[in-house]
């Protein structure tokens, strides 16, 4: 090996990290120092000298040898790092970390000598599945509840209700109370942050506000003032208030009630643009059943994906989780911006940290699941063919041609390819896994679905159907 060649040695570390031990030749160090001096000389302004004509020694005296070496060292490390990655054909997941620290390297740096540098970085983990075929999962057996149709109708009636004033009776559940209130902690007497309002419309329904608040307003009359001694739940959203006792002074300023429309053909026309109540009920039933079936499919797929993830063997580097967390925060910021909110003022360091902490568990699960699917694709040689991508792209031709914005075709192709691959992987899981349904009341598991390539047409098995990997948010 030539004396002026970079020497690279790599050592695998736990958690999918790699250590790079670099020996950088003195020729590289000299070249970078001279390039740094020439670069600074072209822009430095020193009285008595023209730009680019400043003697080397004058420049060193003016700027300082340490500062020059620091600038050169940054260039040396970056240049050698990029070269080392090419030599070893390694794609890093994270920025390299200097093991000895920059200041330590700078202290011993000399352009006349070779330089030894140790850097560490994260790389993609090696993936392995303990098992891919014959996964078995158990889900709760659930039936469509016809009562949900009536509940949906009632909800619709409430949406189209007339609001009328109440003057001759006390408040009751179902009313809309206009209240003012002021809350303080019982032990300290300190006012509760967000616990004060001059006027708020409050629907008197159970589980609104903290326990006892709504119940305390029931039976009050307009003009009444009442003291409520309450307690915040232990799992309350604001940590400072959890489990604390509180005192609220509440005044009932006004009272209203909902006048619900009759369930008839006129209501069907008003609420759902249907000709009759029978037609409206039929439409609601179809929507609810479709949603129910989709939810059941989603639950089944979630269980299969969880089972697959449990079979994954991989040392996942921290940087992969960090990237997922950062992407989640950026997506949240984009949603805020689309709503017209000032992202810069809203996303304080405290909020960003809070979001990072709260989303990390889900981010970790997402990364594990994606890696498990990737491992499945590699293990079972499941791929997306070019004709499948071309066919999918045709669905977007009109949108692309009509869009006023420049569409990144390469990025779109990548997204569509990933979506198609995920669909194929989920179908494969359904066809090669066993799903058991357990009856909640008896707690007995009943086999309802087992399909493999060999038994796909067996009459005693039920093939699970394709679905997308989504959870219904509560």
From Swiss-Prot:
GO biological process: 'de novo' cotranslational protein folding; cell division; chaperone-mediated protein folding; protein transport; protein unfolding
Top-rank taxon: Bacteria
Compositional bias annotation for Low complexity: 442-467
Enzymatic reactions: [protein]-peptidylproline (omega=180) = [protein]-peptidylproline (omega=0)
Alphabetical UniProt keywords: Cell cycle, Cell division, Chaperone, Cytoplasm, Isomerase, Rotamase
Major localization listed first in the record, in broad terms: cytoplasm
Protein's UniProt keywords contain Cytoplasm: yes
Residues of the PPIase FKBP-type domain: 174-261
UniProt-annotated location(s): Cytoplasm
Coiled coil (residue ranges): none
Top class in the EC scheme: isomerase
GO cellular component, one term: cytoplasm
UniProt GO MF annotations: peptidyl-prolyl cis-trans isomerase activity; protein folding chaperone; ribosome binding
PROSITE patterns: FKBP_PPIASE
EC number: 5.2.1.8
UniProt entry tagged with the keyword Cell division: yes
Job of this protein: Involved in protein export. Acts as a chaperone by maintaining the newly synthesized protein in an open conformation. Functions as a peptidyl-prolyl cis-trans isomerase.
Domain characteristics, as noted in the entry: Consists of 3 domains; the N-terminus binds the ribosome, the middle domain has PPIase activity, while the C-terminus has intrinsic chaperone activity on its own.
Family statement: Belongs to the FKBP-type PPIase family. Tig subfamily.
PANTHER family reported in the protein's UniProt record: TRIGGER FACTOR CHAPERONE AND PEPTIDYL-PROLYL CIS/TRANS ISOMERASE, TRIGGER FACTOR-LIKE PROTEIN TIG, CHLOROPLASTIC
Protein's name in the database: Trigger factor
Species of provenance: Prochlorococcus marinus (strain AS9601)
């Amino acid at each position: 090996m030539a004396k002026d060649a970079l020497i690279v040695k790599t050592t695998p570390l736990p958690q999918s990290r790699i250590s790079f031990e670099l020996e950088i030749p003195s020729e590289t160090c000299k070249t970078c120092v001279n390039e740094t001096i020439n670069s600074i000389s072209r822009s430095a302004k020193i009285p008595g000298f023209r730009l680019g004509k400043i003697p080397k020694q004058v420049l060193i005296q003016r700027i300082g040898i340490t500062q020059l070496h620091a600038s050169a060292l940054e260039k040396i490390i970056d240049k050698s790092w990029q070269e080392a990655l090419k030599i070893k054909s390694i794609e890093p997941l994270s920025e390299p970390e200097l093991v000895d620290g920059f200041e330590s390297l700078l202290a011993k740096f000399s352009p006349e000598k070779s330089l030894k540098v140790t850097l560490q970085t994260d790389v993609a983990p090696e993936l392995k599945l303990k098992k891919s075929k014959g996964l078995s999962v158990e889900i709760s057996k659930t039936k469509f509840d016809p009562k949900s149709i009536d509940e949906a109708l009632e909800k619709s009636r409430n949406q189209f209700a007339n609001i009328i004033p109440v003057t001759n009776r006390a408040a009751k559940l179902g009313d809309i109370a206009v209240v003012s209130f002021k809350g303080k902690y019982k032990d300290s007497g300190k006012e509760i942050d967000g616990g004060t309002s001059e006027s708020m419309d409050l629907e008197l329904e159970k589980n609104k506000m903290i326990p006892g608040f709504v119940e305390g307003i029931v039976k009050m009359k307009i003009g009444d003032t009442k003291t409520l001694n309450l307690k915040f739940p232990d799992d309350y959203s604001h940590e400072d208030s959890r489990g604390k006792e509180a005192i609220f002074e509440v005044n009932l300023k006004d009272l209203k009630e909902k006048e619900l429309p009759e369930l008839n053909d006129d209501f069907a026309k008003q609420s759902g643009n249907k000709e009759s109540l029978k037609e409206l009920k039929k439409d609601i039933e179809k929507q609810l059943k479709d949603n129910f079936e989709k939810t059941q499919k989603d639950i089944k797929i979630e269980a299969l994906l969880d089972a697959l993830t449990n079979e994954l063997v991989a040392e996942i580097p921290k940087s992969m989780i960090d990237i997922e967390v950062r992407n989640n925060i950026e997506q949240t910021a984009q949603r805020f911006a689309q709503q017209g909110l000032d992202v810069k003022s809203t996303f304080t360091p405290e909020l960003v940290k809070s979001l990072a902490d709260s989303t990390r568990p889900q981010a970790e699960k997402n990364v594990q699941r994606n890696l498990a699917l990737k491992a499945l694709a590699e293990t079972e040689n499941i791929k997306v063919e070019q004709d499948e991508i071309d066919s999918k792209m045709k669905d977007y031709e009109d949108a692309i041609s009509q869009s006023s914005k420049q569409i990144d075709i390469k990025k779109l192709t990548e997204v569509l390819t990933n979506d198609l691959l995920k669909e194929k992987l989920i179908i494969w899981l359904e066809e090669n896994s066993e799903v058991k349904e357990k009856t909640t009341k008896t707690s007995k598991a009943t086999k309802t679905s087992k399909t493999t390539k060999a038994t796909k047409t067996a009459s005693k098995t039920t093939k699970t159907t394709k679905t997308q990997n989504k959870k219904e948010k509560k």
